[in-house]
Amino acid sequence: SQISQTNTIDYCSNVIYENGVLNMILTEEGYMTFSGNTPIYHYYLKDHQGNNRIIMNQNGTTAEQVNHYYPFGGLFEEGLATSNQNYKYNSKELDRMHGLDWYDYIARMMDSSLGRFIALDPLAEEYYSISPYLCCANNPINAIDPDGKSTWVINNSDGTYRVVGGLLEDNDPNIYVYTIEDGQLIRGESIGVTT
């Protein structure tokens, strides 16, 4: 049997084209689709880990999609799927091609049914005490993996900041408190050292 692809998807930063036609513009709060030249806004309602739980219409009056997840992002219910947007668990794109249902974490793909990445961690030498295929250090309730390379620990007390492991690329073992201001991640005080 042969596999034939009928759609071409091109990504230019946060702009997505399908078959050469503008399809979607991603924003921090959601995304825009178009009816002719008129933009239609869709907004994400996220949980403490950045998972897109509900997609609301531009008026905020109608839920277009509701997502319920298993701990590693597998969908156990996808209700009200009038929206076909694929940015779900940890706000990562769910690639459903060929029925694989893998999340695109930029550096590598994650299989949510296994809770494992399908490729070796590019920073595996820095995390020798854990498997190089684990997602979120095997703790998806208290941690997220923003790019498939490093794990961030979330402070659940009020949801306003995240505790982020030291940047191993520059050999800094400190753990910092980060805040988000005007959409930018700002590094604050050091609260400890990684071991």
Predicted features by range, described:
Residues 2-5, 187:
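Surface-exposed charge patches in extracellular/virion surface proteins
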